[in-house]
Amino acid sequence: MDGERELPAGWAWAKLGDIADTALGKMLDKKQSTGLHPTPYLRNVNVQWGRIDSTDLSTMDIEPEEKGRFTVSMGDLIVCEGGEIGRCAIWNVPEPIAYQKALHRVRPSSVLETKYLRYYLEHAASSGKLVRFATGSTIKHLPQQRLREVPVPLPPVAEQRRIVEVLEEQLSRLDAAVASLDSCQGRAHGLRSAAMTVALQRVDDAATKRLGELIKEPLRNGHSAKATSDPFGIRTLNLTAVTQGVFSDTNTKLTVADPHRVRDLWLTRGDILVQRSNTPELVGTTAMYEGADDWAIFPDLLIRVRVNDDVLPEYVTLILQSRRGRSYFRARAKGLAGSMPKIDQSTIENFTMPVPSLEVQERVVVEVRDEMERVARVSSELDRARRRSVGLRNALLCTAFDGKLVHQDPRDEAAQVALARVTADRAAQPKTKRPRKAAVKRSAKAPAPRAAEAIGPAPEPTPAPALAVQQEFDL
């Protein structure tokens, strides 16, 4: 049907709209809200692959007579219309729930198992089959009419159930392995922090100084300017460079900054950069620049620290990145409700730290760096295994929908036969008319005043046109 491949015996291609009923949810319109019927509803963000997170639900006004139209019932498949198109999950809760227009409600007919469709849409999304049905250049959308055109390889219903059974058995094992990998990755991150803590315990007895006593020049905020496509623009870091500790072209942008104004903001090796504003978890995040001099400037949300010869910049960076440093900045960050918490230069200057000899500082830096490299190797292997798990999942789904996962039973009713029956049943059903909105009565306009001196008799009045009733827009 879609020209992709030949199907196994007993299978058939069918457009989704021919084997399932689809409907979009209610459009969110705060202007029309009366506040009389607040109803929890599902949004795009609530629907993930194979699961629905209903812990954070918004509410909107839905009239009682609309609830049947804009709710999902137990067993319905909910499909994302935008963003990651095709992402879907089954509503398995007895109580119905409303849903927004960013979601499709799909109710398969008797020839299509809901779980089979759920896994097929995952396969179609991961393999790129859904892209040609999407609209939009930046944020992709899957309009209802396009969703209904998606071709589905349809095995006999009994075979669909066998496919789902094997998929769930194998995927549950794969999911358990992935959960274990994620747990190990979390412990690897913990090892980084532990390694730093152990190394820094060796300098607890050293004399302490304020960071303000260890700088060779005043702290400096950066400068932010509008981005430009001009290749001769000023390369400027973004916050991600410091958050990730990765100073690359990817984490910069070219800006229209005035070269004269930013002449003192070019980075040099050993510059320490501290985020002066970010989320509560990230404010105070620190990284040291180790690249070539004059490669980029830094933005206003970063504060540059240049230390004197009493301390190694690598050592100071470790102290600021430690649990003690992170806790210090979080505790002193200030911000109004709804705004990003901030720290200022004095907060950084007043941070106290142990200052051992340069020889001890270097030993600490080398010890932490060696441990970090070992942890990074472990983390890299875990990432590689995680990517392999994605490949295994995709391969399993591909095998299933190529008809190679389970055996074909000649006793099963062929999909073509079942499709013909469903088509005949649908044709025999009377077409239901869509409800129309009630016409709004309009007050008659007052007649225009007659001219003071009318010439000749007044013309006969023309019949008023009938009031048009707009048919309800198909959501």
Task: Briefly describe each language-model feature range.
Residues 1-26, 149-164, 169-221, 350, ...:
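Non-catalytic DNA-recognition/assembly elements of restriction-modification systems
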Residues 9, 81, 97-104, 112-115, ...:
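A short glycine-rich beta-alpha junction/loop motif
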Residues 17-32, 45-74, 212-226, 240-272:
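Sequence-specific dsDNA recognition surfaces
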Residues 29-37, 132-134, 208-209, 224-232, ...:
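Short coil/turn segments at secondary-structure boundaries
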Residues 46-59, 77-100, 115-119, 127-133, ...:
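Short, ligand-facing micro-motifs at secondary-structure edges
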Residues 406-428, 432:
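Amphipathic heptad-repeat alpha-helical coiled-coil/stalk segments that mediate oligomerization
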